[in-house]
């Protein structure tokens, strides 16, 4: 009986580049899982830029993960409106003009998502009322979907003109650079979940009861840098030599003293206590105790609800855990999917090896 068509051995039908392809996919999957780790620390820089002048109003850098590096950003209104803003001499060229700018309400409109009728850059994306999502005004503009909130900082209302402390150091209330219109930018919950791969733009306007409200625009940019490879840690040089646990010192019974020769005074010899080197267990307990003392002195509120954990094998890493709620549902699913993909690819590689 003739065999069926295409009855060549299985190994003749397999792509000879199969192992390399599978290996490349495995490496790529491993890199993807490592890159998507929510615990990886980066050097994150947030930058607020005045788009009218190109000047940087704020640049804040910090170390953190992609899910928690969202600090408050502090800058000044004069960093956004500059010296000469419009034809009504509203700006920050003189100390008096800076003080005057403090008397106006301000409102902010997003340029990253522009609703219908809100205009473009010329209107500061505030082409009609209702486009504003945040600010400091009597009608309290707010939004449930915008990425930031921008409010005025704490400035005493009775503070006088905005004098520069480097020029007028003797004037009460003078500040560095004459800045007396502090602003505070905070990230909303939506902003902490948004993608910041590209700059995002907002328009800012000061509210005036008559005339046109002047416009300025600013951008917010995030720059993420890898802090480099991790440096291996350990072993702890203090407890590198392993010793058994300390044992109670053996009590040596003294021998009966020899009677002194006739005519000499009796001298009782002093015996030094036997020296005992602490064992590994003693030093580990001392390490935990010292860590607790340091934690208790620096953050006494944390010692009431935290655990001190010590790995029982070298290099004896020590960790601090605080009780709280946490949810890693999304992270757990992505991790499981990544492991399943790797196991599937390993199975394919194993089958190829068996048939070759």
Curated annotation (Swiss-Prot):
Residues 33-331 are virion surface. Glycans are attached at residues 43, 58, 296, 328. The keyword Glycoprotein applies. It holds the Pfam family TLV_coat. Residues 1-32 form the signal peptide. It is found in: Host endoplasmic reticulum membrane; Host cell membrane; Virion membrane. A motif (CXXC) lies at residues 306-309. Residues 247-279 are annotated as: Disordered. One of its GO terms (biological process) is fusion of virus membrane with host plasma membrane. GO terms for cellular component: host cell endoplasmic reticulum membrane; host cell plasma membrane; membrane; viral envelope; virion membrane. Homooligomer. Forms heterooligomers with mouse EPOR, probably via their respective transmembrane domains. BB6 deletion mutant does not interact with mouse MST1R isoform sf-Stk. Compared to other gammaretroviruses which possess 2 envelope proteins (gp70 and p15E), FSFFV gp55 corresponds to a gp70-p15E fusion protein with a deletion of a portion of p15E. It is encoded by the defective env gene of the virus. Strain BB6 gp42 is a truncated form of gp55. This is Glycoprotein 42.
């Amino acid at each position: 009986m003739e065999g069926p068509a295409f009855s060549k051995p299985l190994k003749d039908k397999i792509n000879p580049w199969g192992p390399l392809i599978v290996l490349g996919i495995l490496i790529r999957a491993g890199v993807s899982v490592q890159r998507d780790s929510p615990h990886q620390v980066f050097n994150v820089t947030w930058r607020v830029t005045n788009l009218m002048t190109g000047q940087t109003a704020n640049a804040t850098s910090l170390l953190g993960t992609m899910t928690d590096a969202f600090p408050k950003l502090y800058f000044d209104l004069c960093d956004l409106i500059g010296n000469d803003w419009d034809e009504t001499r509203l700006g920050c060229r003189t100390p008096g003009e800076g003080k005057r700018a403090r008397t106006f309400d301000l409102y902010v409109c997003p340029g990253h998502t522009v609703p219908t009728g809100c205009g473009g850059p010329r209107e500061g994306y505030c082409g009609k009322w209702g486009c504003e999502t945040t600010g400091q005004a009597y009608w309290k503009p707010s939004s449930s979907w915008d990425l930031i909130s921008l409010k005025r900082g704490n400035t005493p209302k009775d503070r006088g003109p905005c004098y520069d402390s480097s020029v007028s150091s003797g004037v009460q209330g003078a500040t560095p650079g004459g800045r007396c219109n502090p602003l505070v930018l905070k990230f909303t919950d939506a902003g902490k979940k948004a993608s910041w791969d590209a700059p995002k733009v907002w328009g800012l306007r000061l509210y005036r009861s008559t005339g046109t409200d002047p416009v300025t625009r600013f951008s917010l940019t995030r720059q993420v840098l890898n802090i480099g490879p991790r440096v291996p840690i350990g072993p702890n040089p203090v407890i590198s030599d392993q010793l058994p646990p300390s044992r109670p010192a053996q009590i040596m019974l003294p021998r009966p003293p020899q009677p002194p020769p006739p005519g000499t005074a009796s001298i009782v010899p002093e015996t030094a206590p036997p020296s005992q080197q602490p064992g590994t267990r003693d030093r580990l307990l001392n390490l935990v105790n010292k860590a607790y003392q340091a934690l208790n002195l620096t953050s006494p509120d944390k010692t009431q609800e935290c655990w001190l954990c010590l790995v029982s094998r070298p290099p004896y890493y020590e960790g601090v855990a605080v009780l709280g709620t946490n949810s890693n549902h999304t992270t757990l699913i992505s991790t499981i999917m990544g492991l399943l993909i790797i196991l599937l690819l390993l199975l394919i590689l194993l089958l190829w090896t068996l048939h070759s």
